[in-house]
Amino acid sequence: MITSSRHPYYYTISFALLIAAGMWGLFWIPQRALEAGGLTGGWATISQMVIPFAMLLPISLWRLYKGQSFGLEYPLIGLLFGGGIACYANSFLLTDVVRALILFYITPVWTTIFEIVFLRQIPRFYRYITLALALSGVWIVFGQEGVIPLPQNSGDWIALLGGILIAASAVRMEIKKPEGIYPILFSFFFYGGLFTLIQSYFLSDYLGDAPSIESWVAMMPWLLLIAIL
């Protein structure tokens, strides 16, 4: 068995994760605003992958010219990470916000399972507290009238899948230990963009038709702002 040691910047990283989790918890606000502005058919999610990819592409080409990492050498990490976020983003368009958040944020359950199976790590005691809180939230939201708390629509299942993919990507990164953040970032947008295109095609009956040119023009400033942020 491999026992994990605490990182020297454990509390700093934990605080950063807390802020990041809170910001991702508010992601449904711009996502639904973009849909209300006309970006139907899951194209709000697609554009949030494709536009940053296009902005980073010149940097990747420059890195390739300099003999550095181009950024596409982690396809599995990019596919899992980008696919997880794509599922999370599109789930807000197909189910209630609270249901999407609860199902996505039980990610620690899947992370713990993957760590035990693939990394042979023994969870610390506070992980069990996290798991208990996560599963309690699922039971409160989905376990009404004593029924088994299972997802009830396509948006629920997509949110659940998103959490599983994010957990798998975290474990994969722990195994591969990539050097630097840029290759992960570029792989995320490239492979995540491919995932969103395929997902939107298969979910077209649920997500709606492609947006009009007028909607693209009206929403483009907001899409560029989101991409920069």
Language model segments and positions:
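Hydrophobic/aromatic residues within transmembrane alpha-helices
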Residues: 34, 44, 91-92, 117-119, ...
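Membrane-interface helix termini and inter-helical loops of multi-pass transporters
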Residues: 29-41, 142-154, 201-223
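Structural motif at transmembrane-helix junctions in multi-pass transporters
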Residues: 36-43, 87-103, 181-182
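Glycine-/small-residue-enriched transmembrane alpha-helix faces in small-molecule transporters
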Residues: 1-43, 87, 132, 136, ...
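Loop-to-transmembrane-helix transition segments
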Residues: 12-20, 64-87, 153-162, 209-229
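Transmembrane alpha-helices of multi-pass small-molecule transport proteins
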Residues: 12-13, 37-83, 110, 164-169, ...
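C-terminal transmembrane-helix exit sites in multi-pass transporters
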Residues: 60-63, 90, 107-132
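Hydrophobic transmembrane alpha-helices of multi-pass small-molecule transport proteins
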Residues: 56, 126-144
